From Swiss-Prot:
This is Transcription factor Sp5. Binds to GC boxes promoters elements. Probable transcriptional activator that has a role in the coordination of changes in transcription required to generate pattern in the developing embryo. A motif (9aaTAD) lies at residues 187-195. It holds the Pfam family zf-C2H2. The 9aaTAD motif is a transactivation domain present in a large number of yeast and animal transcription factors. A zinc finger (C2H2-type) spans 296-320, 326-350, 356-378. One of its GO terms (cellular component) is chromatin. InterPro entries: Znf_C2H2_sf, Znf_C2H2_type. Signal peptide: none annotated. Its main location: nucleus. Residues 160-204 are annotated as: Disordered. It comes from Homo sapiens. Belongs to the Sp1 C2H2-type zinc-finger protein family.
Length: 398
């Protein structure tokens, strides 16, 4: 039978007897509160042997509810029993005959990953207080990006000066101006300036543009060959630069060439704009009547309509081909039209705009043809009134 240790103190026994449901003083020693007090007083005391002020009393299982709460260790309990708990660790100083609420784990049990609720180290060596000192021990060459939480965490007032100062931002890459070098006064305006010989030159001889971002890693590197650069610059000068005498020699020829090419270019542009048979036939021959207005004829067989503007002919050709490039973008409409003015007229049906007003009565209309039809009604009324007046005068004369 298991044995439990009960404290002999008379004051504690009297305290427990007053709070037990049983009025018998003999049963007070076996009450659940007595067992709980004895167990709690035994926790944490070193020593394998029980002190002399403890008495070995038998445990009565007839108490009922305590038997379901406490499972004391016994010496005769088999080690392979599934309900048996492992023996306590020798370092705790407990024997199997003593009751313990918290079972002791073996030496091979893994430690918990979280620290205990009541740590044994003082506050000076806690992880919270060691954080500023560990950050101060970081080398100065370490970039702030390696410790992202150190730069943003709130520190105690006394540890703000332990952080290393942030490194200064890197200077922006120095870019040279991408503009042509100023030409000297003695060179003519049509000559190409000399290429810069400095290290910031772009490497293209005769370009006159400086290199872009000398410190940029992606800038192209050209071989610094002075002989090749000089030879290329000389060849470029001989091919492109015209001196004053050369320019005066070719100036008349250039002017004559420009004058002869101008009418040809205008004729070619005119032929490209209109593809009607009339324009194609008159493209190479001079016009018979210079003052006559150009007419554009539809080339579709059987049509032969004539228009005074190319845009009108193009709109007419869309009617033949069925092309409708002008689409209404109103919600749930999507109608397409051949001409843009048809689309604008259709949009007024959505917006309700009436831009055409009658000068006689002020009535407004969406379309101009509706207004013209309405104006005719006013004219007809005037004619009727005039006719009625003439008839009256004729009747008076009779």
């Amino acid at each position: 039978m298991a044995a439990v240790a009960v404290l002999r103190n008379d004051s504690l026994q009297a305290f427990l007897q007053d709070r037990t449901p049983s009025a018998s003083p003999d049963l007070g020693k076996h009450s659940p509160l007595a067992l709980l007090a004895a167990t709690c007083s035994r926790i944490g005391q070193p020593g394998a042997a029980a002190p002399p002020d403890f008495l070995q009393v038998p445990y009565d299982p007839a108490l009922g509810s305590p038997s379901r709460l406490f499972h004391p260790w016994t010496a005769d309990m088999p080690a392979h029993s599934p309900g048996a708990l492992p023996p306590p660790h020798p370092s705790l100083g407990l024997t199997p005959q003593k009751t313990h609420l918290q079972p002791s784990f073996g030496a091979a049990h893994e430690l918990p990953l979280t620290p205990p609720a009541d740590p044994s180290y003082p506050y000076e060596f806690s992880p919270v207080k060691m954080l500023p000192s560990s950050m101060a021990a970081l080398p100065a060459s370490c970039a702030p990006a390696y410790v992202p939480y150190a730069a943003q965490a709130a520190l105690p007032p006394g540890y703000s000066n332990l952080l290393p100062p942030p490194p200064p931002p890197p200077p922006p890459p120095t870019c040279r101006q991408l503009s042509p070098n100023p030409a000297p006064d003695d060179l003519p305006w049509w000559s190409i300036p000399q290429a810069g010989a400095g290290p910031g030159a772009s490497g293209v001889p005769g370009s006159g543009l400086s290199g872009a971002c000398a410190g940029a890693p992606h800038a192209p590197r050209f071989p610094a060959s002075a002989a090749a650069a000089a030879a290329a610059a000389a060849a470029l000068q001989r091919g492109l630069v015209l001196g004053p005498s050369d320019f005066a020699q070719y100036q008349s020829q250039i002017a004559a060439l420009l004058q002869t090419k101008a009418p040809l270019a205008a004729t070619a542009r005119r032929c490209r704009r209109c593809r009607c048979p009339n324009c194609q036939a008159a493209g190479g021959a001079p016009e018979a009547e210079p003052g006559k207005k150009k007419q554009h004829v539809c080339h579709v067989p059987g049509c032969g309509k004539v228009y005074g503007k190319t845009s009108h002919l193009k709109a007419h050709l869309r009617w033949h081909t069925g092309e409708r490039p002008f689409v209404c973008n109103w919600l749930f409409c999507g109608k397409s039209f051949t001409r843009s003015d048809e689309l604008q007229r259709h949009l007024r049906t959505h917006t309700g705009e009436k831009r055409f007003a009658c000068p006689e009565c002020g009535k407004r209309f969406m379309r101009s043809d509706h207004l013209a039809k309405h104006v005719k009604t006013h004219q007809n009324k005037k004619l009727k009134v005039a006719e009625a007046g003439v008839k009256r005068e004729d009747a008076r004369d009779l």
